[in-house]
Amino acid sequence: MSSSIPPRLYDMSPTESKKQEDVSETELVYPVELADATIQPSKSDDDLFDSNDFSKTYLAKSRILSNAMNEIGFGRYQWYLFFVAGFGWMSDNIWPVCTSLILMRLDEVDGPHPPAEGRAPYLTLSQNLGLLVGAMVWSLSADTIGRRWAFNLTFLFTGVFAVIAGASPNFASICVFDALWSFGVGGNLPVDSAIFLEALPSSHQWLLTVMSFWWAIGQVIANLVSWGLISNFSCPDDESVCHRADNKGWRYFLFTMGGMTLLMFAARFLVSVYESPKFYLAKGDDYKAVETIHKIARINGKTCTLTVEELYAIDRQEQEESDLDDSKSSDAKSVTQGTTNLIVEKLRKYNFEHIRQCFGSRKLAISSILVILSWAVIGLAFPLYNAFLPYYLETRGNANEPLSVAKTYRNSLIVSAIGVPGSLIAGVLVEFRIGRKGTLCLSLILTGVFLFASTTAKTSNAYLGWNCTFSFFSDIMYGVLYAYTPEVFPSKVRGTAVGLAASANRILGIFSPVIAMRANLTTSAPIFVSGALFIFAGILVVFFPYEPRGKSSF
């Protein structure tokens, strides 16, 4: 008996009946007549990985799923994902920016007198600790339990604790809630990049770079809201004593941004996203992988010739080969075991195999080490400078004439808006001959160069101009970095690998507020350190072994 799914977005709602969701079993198992089923060559010109990196069986099956996705093409389901997954990029930038925007406005949280000098960096430290734990926990869960759980729950954590933070009675509680909402934020990119990339045909993988458009938009939204709320509901600059009744802007700001995050959670939850077919493949559930491919095809209004028998045929051939080594036999067993294991069993058997597989071959190990190291270096460089950007804008230029609160947040908005076209340009550049590596290398070096140049500014307007240039190139850099990283890891370890890179980024990010506590921010030293780190990261990119342009990412 066959049932179909009309190509409408609301058919993805979890309230739809299971009967309407199911794809015909006959359609999945009995295809057009199958040619001789053989494991395809270890690598074609369009593949990024070969059998030295992962098992021949896994790569052959993954290639079949990629070809099926290419057959379906880019359609309604991918457009939907472009928006709801884009929320993850927005959130990843909104909340670190939110921390920097409220840093200088917490005068009244422990009474009417200003806080002790040097206390503000502890808030950034709390944020980075939360981001670190979130990156590790959510990314590992994405490769063991599944992408969908983390895809939804990260936003719930973030929104709830951000709203609660707006009612914080003291500075210590703000730090605690900042760490908790950052725990949710830490899982956005490792999970969302995986679920979006694995639903794309190879011809549209460049869209993963364009997703950084949402990252830039998140910064614009945060700065726009802060300009309207914090600048109008904060203690006047000329008052030496700040009372809570006069300083509610940062609270209104957190209520607003937390509420917005909960709305994005509702959008994801009410119109659900399918689990990634390649996650099912990595877990050995070939049937569910093929079923999900067919569901996506129906939403796009397309037909798909893929059947589960094509995947089973690869297993049969491998079992017939007597010269398989133990590691391949173990892999074949895991591929055929199905989804009868419970979540608890999956976690019990998780013995860091996912982490080991990120370094499975010499080439893959070199790639993993360099990518993780680059993320770590950038993790120190960016927050060292950007987390304290409002402070820099307020205190630099025109000798001893600080900017007003309104002008400080206006300038932050201008800087963030300049980054939006940079994100879009990044999506174009990665398809040119210089590819992902060339674009990433140049944007990193130019980011560092313009940070150096900003130290020559003598007025606040000149400093603002240099910061706009920095914002433009740094958004190009982040767009490519966030796309390149999931592309150069196979789907079976993609969440873990991106999580490792993000964790390294957060670990080094923890040192930025520590440095700020010890450094003199009235000098240009933090800027020089940050610029040098960006240039060093650009040099590392030259040695990346993989170039994903024009390749299928499995």
UniProtKB/Swiss-Prot annotation:
It is found in: Endoplasmic reticulum; Membrane. GO terms for molecular function: transmembrane transporter activity. Residues 1-25 are annotated as: Disordered. SUPFAM superfamilies: MFS general substrate transporter. The modification Phosphoserine is found at residues 13, 334. Keywords: Endoplasmic reticulum, Membrane, Phosphoprotein, Transmembrane, Transmembrane helix, Transport. Pfam families: MFS_1. It is a multi-pass membrane protein. It comes from the Eukaryota. The chain crosses the membrane at residues 82-102, 120-140, 149-169, 171-191, 210-230, 253-273, 364-384, 412-432, 437-457, 462-482, 497-517, 525-545. One of its GO terms (cellular component) is membrane. Gene3D superfamilies: MFS general substrate transporter like domains. Belongs to the major facilitator superfamily. This is Uncharacterized MFS-type transporter PB1E7.08c.
